[in-house]
Amino acid sequence: MPDHSQFNVEHTYPGMWTITFSNPPINMFVPTTIVELGTLMADLEADPCLKVVVFQSMNPDFFIAHLDVSKAAERPEVLGLWREFVLRLSSTRVVSIAKIRGRTRGIGNEFVLACDMRFASRQTAIFGNPEIGVGAGRRRAGMAPACGRPLAGTRDRAQRRRFRC
């Protein structure tokens, strides 16, 4: 498994990985993050023993801040890679869980919606869409439409019942 600069991968238990975002100071997604997530997705799909992956943040104030649009403009191909990653994550056999503490905005919202389950801290979780403030909806901004899945979609509810959460 390759080293990643934007997050740490820990094989927590047999069949379970914990991915910890660590891109200080605010866990902003940059093109490198998206490329590395694509590599991570290939690793997840290639491990037949993997059952669960938990995504969390090292920073208690930010889960995923947002996309650095100035850097993304330099590499427009990453938006296609992002769409591919979100769709693969939402349909993989591995159960994906977002453990949310702190702010989650823009691309971070799309990320957590692609996960099968999401658990947010009542004390610190804050969700926001900065695209709205600049008049750019997700589709016009070129971002993936959160897989068309509502926040509490049927797969999410089914997984919670399955695991008795």
Give each language-model segment a name:
Residues S90-C165:
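Crotonase-fold acyl-CoA enzyme core
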Residues L40-D43, L81-R93:
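Catalytic-core regions built around general acid/base machinery
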Residues M1-Q56, P60:
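Conserved CoA-thioester-binding segment of acyl-CoA-metabolizing enzymes
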Residues P31-T32, L67, E110, R139:
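Generic recognition of short, well-ordered alpha-helical segments
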Residues I19, F55, D68, F111-L113:
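Hydrophobic/aromatic residues within transmembrane alpha-helices
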Residues M28, I64, I107:
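Residues that form or flank phosphate/diphosphate-binding pockets in enzymes
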Residues N23-I26, V69-S70, A125:
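A short, flexible beta-alpha/helix-coil linker loop
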Residues V35, C49, S57-R88, T104:
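Glycine- (often His-adjacent) and acidic-residue-rich active-site loop
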